[in-house]
């Protein structure tokens, strides 16, 4: 079953950000572009941390989510120089409720698959990627995908081709285009 256009369910979770605990709810993600990043490894978190200001500059917030507690996130932050670079919220999902809602929970292991989800300002999933646990994700491609999602949201008569970047040509689906690509 596809998650595209699925509305994110109501939630309230504890998070660790800026050396403090806070609560994050569905209301916090509405009105901006959000990227939810489940089951993470340090290299991916660092990649996102290095690109965090770029995401913020296009009105996007990053949330990393794991099935650990917010206390585990703080302990990890305190022990790892890599994790100390993170400025975005690290959401705790110890019950797996968010992982189940995003359909990435591995029940037999009590953990989530690696997934990246782009949620529009209305709270609907517009793009996602779920990959094997032994393959890392790329923040540059995720950033490009957010930009493309933002573009087509405001240009509903156009689509962004592979490798599209802001300012590049888009396509306007039509009968005249069929068979020409």
Language-model-detected regions and their locations in the chain:
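Chalcogenol-based redox active-site neighborhoods
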Residues: 1-181
